[in-house]
């Protein structure tokens, strides 16, 4: 091994350690903030074969080893009988991890193809079918929580989709009760950036299985919103972080939803509410400082390589 190759390997190891630590920290923080996992929980980890769910399983298994509480993980994949689906990939990978898992075989592909006209988006029907099957499976496995791999970017995309097309300020909750009222659904990656997950997935070399039903369909509204947010992220560094922070700093008295705030009762005796407002001038917004968390691209001999994986 040449000195140059050795240095590159050290730089890659440093980058991996730093990235893994950040994703673990963000995941652990989300779990704590929303009380996602409790002692004795049996978590059904929904594994689609994509980068997000692979990363979620990886990080949850890592956290499981050092967590102050005890919880179980069982990975579940839904084989929807898509033509060309590599049935051997996930069982081989999960066997190598030594994690408990279940492959559920349901031919939802044929149902979707039969019910949805050619050229129309299959996402809505496919999603409903998957949810029903996964809820049933969670009950069969005795799972107390269902973990999904949605990340911070998914949550923001959903917020803008609802504003643009649904007339609602509604995102994707990090924790909720399932549609049938029988399960608690959690999103441990809610604080994680998609670009971090992409880098981490590439470094880990997961056996990614592409979805031929929804992600590959052109002209989807979500893809348009994703492209918009990616463009903002490149042109205005920090904007994505600030927007997500805004979702955790909602001020109902300064919006217009009278179901959330009693505007009718306000009079001059009400006093200043939530900092008041500027009546005739635009409010001055202080710029938000965003920490640059990019990884090192070249090896620096001064870097400490014994990074502790929290």
Curated annotation (Swiss-Prot):
It catalyses: cytidine(32) in tRNA + S-sulfanyl-L-cysteinyl-[cysteine desulfurase] + AH2 + ATP = 2-thiocytidine(32) in tRNA + L-cysteinyl-[cysteine desulfurase] + A + AMP + diphosphate + H(+). [4Fe-4S] cluster binds at residues 123, 126, 214. The keyword tRNA processing applies. Pathway: tRNA modification. GO terms for biological process: tRNA thio-modification. A motif (PP-loop motif) lies at residues 48-53. It is found in: Cytoplasm. Its main location: cytoplasm. Its EC number is 2.8.1.-. GO terms for molecular function: 4 iron, 4 sulfur cluster binding; ATP binding; magnesium ion binding; sulfurtransferase activity; tRNA binding. Homodimer. This is tRNA-cytidine(32) 2-sulfurtransferase. The lineage of its organism: Bacteria, Pseudomonadati, Pseudomonadota, Gammaproteobacteria, Vibrionales. The gene is ttcA.
């Amino acid at each position: 091994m040449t000195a140059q190759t050795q240095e590159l390997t050290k730089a890659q190891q440093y980058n991996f350690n730093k990235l893994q630590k950040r994703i673990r920290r963000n995941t652990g923080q989300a779990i704590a903030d929303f009380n996602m996992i409790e002692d004795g929980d049996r978590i059904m980890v929904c594994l689609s074969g994509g980068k997000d769910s692979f990363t979620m399983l990886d990080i949850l298994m890592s956290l499981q080893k050092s967590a102050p509480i005890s919880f179980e993980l069982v990975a579940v994949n839904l084989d929807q009988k898509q033509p060309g689906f590599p049935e051997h990939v996930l069982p081989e990978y999960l066997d190598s991890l030594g994690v408990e898992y279940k492959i559920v075989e349901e031919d939802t592909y044929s149902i979707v193809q039969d019910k949805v006209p050619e050229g129309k988006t299959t996402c809505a029907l496919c999603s409903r079918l998957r949810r029903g099957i996964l809820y049933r499976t969670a009950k069969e496995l005795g799972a107390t929580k269902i973990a999904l791999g949605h990340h911070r970017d998914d949550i923001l995309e959903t917020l803008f989709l609802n504003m643009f097309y649904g007339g609602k300020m509604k995102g994707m909750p990090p924790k909720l009760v399932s549609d049938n009222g029988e399960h608690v659904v959690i999103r441990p990656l809610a604080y994680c950036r998609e670009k971090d997950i992409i880098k981490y997935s590439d470094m880990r070399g997961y056996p990614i299985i592409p979805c031929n039903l929804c992600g590959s369909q052109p002209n989807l509204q979500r893809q348009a919103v994703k492209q918009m947010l990616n463009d903002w992220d490149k042109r205005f560094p920090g904007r994505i972080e600030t927007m997500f922070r805004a979702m955790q700093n909602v001020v109902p008295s300064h919006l217009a939803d009278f179901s959330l705030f009693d505007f009718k009762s306000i009079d001059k005796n009400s006093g200043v509410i939530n900092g008041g407002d500027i009546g005739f001038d635009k409010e001055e917004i202080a710029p938000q400082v965003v920490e640059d968390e990019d990884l090192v691209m070249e090896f620096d001999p001064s870097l400490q390589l014994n990074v502790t994986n929290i």
